[in-house]
């Protein structure tokens, strides 16, 4: 009775515990089946999977765990980024292509490099011997012997479990049982030492962030030194040639961090374009104002000439007839102030008149129509039915008797 009550209390305690967050990294050579395995666990079809470029992140719920799996690409050029994910991982899933015997040595070297990393050593490792459904696939014992798996895990003090499986045989609830059993084993071992592993993950993550900040500062310092050396060389070369060098004032922030966010760059470009447009508008307004001033001056000069011509005309004292004949006729002029000035200089340029559109059917060849065909002979007898038929000419025919003629 006492044991039953203790078991019930333990069950209630576990049931009330919050879900634990666990991060796993899935690594292995390219074409080993990592993405197919993740999709099968997630409940998606593992068929027609494209190679992973970089990494992909998958979140899923597994029992009392909220699992985040980082599926890392296995190409040679991408394996260098694996170490950036080791610090926040609670465990490792290493996928092996058991049917690719030619690359088994490369698999061994890669696995040894992963397990010997200081941020992976001591963490539980699950090895999935994938593609067991293909012909020529290596057995579990052969893989352990070829990879020297027992030696590697003992040297790095890692708990290890190997599961032969095939990721393409099912997904979701029908996923390969070996994959499901291996994942449960990995999560259970993490749960047994969750506090220690979580503390180690937090410590490694903080150290990695500090290291990244230090590397960032060192890169910025190297860039600054390179710029200073280049400016010094340009200044010395300008002094030797006897020319002055215009030094640009650089922002302290840009000197400290040469890599600026794209939003800042876009904002600066937009401001520069706005300034250029404003300067262009001011230049156009200045040109238009100068043209208007010239037109006003010309109008004033013409008015003064007209007034002088009127004053210089002598007053006539002769008779009205002579005055009318000698009166000076004023020449009509079109003053500039009566003209309509264009708003812009571009519109003032005369435009060549566009020819009107050609009429419909222009240049269409004329069709020479044939005359109407008429029947041969004269069929138009208007008085044919109004007159009697002409008499038939009687021709003499011989009778049976000689020289007898019927009249």
UniProtKB/Swiss-Prot annotation:
Interacts with EXOC2; regulates ARL13B localization to the cilium membrane. Residues 298-309 have a biased composition (Acidic residues). It is a lipid-anchor. Residues 195-313 form a coiled coil. Residues 285-295 have a biased composition (Polar residues). Belongs to the small GTPase superfamily. Arf family. Cilium-specific. The keyword Cell membrane applies. It comes from Danio rerio (Zebrafish). Gene3D superfamilies: P-loop containing nucleotide triphosphate hydrolases. This is ADP-ribosylation factor-like protein 13B. GO terms for molecular function: GTP binding; GTPase activity. The keyword Lipoprotein applies.
């Amino acid at each position: 009775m006492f044991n039953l009550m203790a078991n019930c209390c333990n069950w209630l305690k576990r049931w009330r515990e919050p879900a634990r967050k666990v991060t796993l990294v899935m690594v292995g050579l390219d074409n080993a089946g990592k993405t197919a395995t993740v999709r099968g666990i997630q409940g998606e079809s593992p068929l027609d999977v494209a190679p992973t470029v970089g990494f992909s992140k998958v979140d899923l719920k597994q029992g009392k765990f909220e699992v985040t799996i980082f599926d890392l690409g296995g190409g040679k050029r991408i394996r260098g980024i694996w170490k950036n994910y080791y610090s926040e991982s609670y465990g490792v899933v290493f996928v092996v292509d058991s049917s690719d015997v030619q690359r088994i040595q490369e698999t061994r070297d890669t696995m040894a490099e992963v397990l010997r990393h200081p941020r992976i050593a001591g963490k539980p490792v699950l090895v999935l011997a994938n593609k067991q459904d293909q012909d020529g696939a290596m057995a579990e014992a052969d893989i352990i012997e070829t990879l020297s798996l027992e030696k590697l895990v003992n040297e790095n003090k890692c708990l290890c479990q190997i599961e032969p499986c095939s990721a393409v045989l099912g997904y979701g609830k029908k996923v390969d049982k070996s994959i499901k059993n291996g994942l449960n084993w990995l999560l259970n071992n993490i749960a047994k030492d969750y506090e220690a592993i979580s503390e180690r993950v937090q410590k490694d993550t903080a150290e990695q962030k500090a290291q990244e900040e230090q590397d960032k500062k060192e890169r910025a310092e190297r860039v600054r030194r390179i710029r200073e050396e280049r400016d010094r060389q340009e200044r010395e070369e300008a002094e030797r040639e006897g020319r002055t060098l215009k030094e640009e004032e650089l922002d302290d922030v840009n000197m400290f961090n040469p890599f600026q966010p794209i939003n800042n760059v876009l904002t600066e470009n937009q401001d520069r374009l706005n300034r250029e447009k404003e300067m262009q508008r001011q230049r156009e307004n200045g040109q238009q104002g100068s043209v208007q001033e010239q037109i006003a001056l010309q109008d004033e000069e013409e008015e003064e000439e007209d007034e002088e011509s009127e004053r210089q005309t002598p007053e006539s004292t002769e008779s009205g007839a002579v005055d009318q004949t000698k009166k000076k006729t004023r020449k009509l002029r079109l003053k500039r102030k009566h003209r309509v000035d264009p708003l812009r200089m571009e519109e003032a340029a005369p435009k060549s008149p566009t020819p009107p559109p050609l009429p419909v059917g222009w240049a269409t060849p004329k069709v020479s129509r044939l005359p109407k065909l008429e029947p041969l002979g004269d069929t138009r007898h208007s008085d044919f039915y109004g007159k009697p038929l002409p008499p038939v000419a009687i021709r003499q025919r011989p009778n049976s008797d000689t020289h007898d003629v019927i009249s």
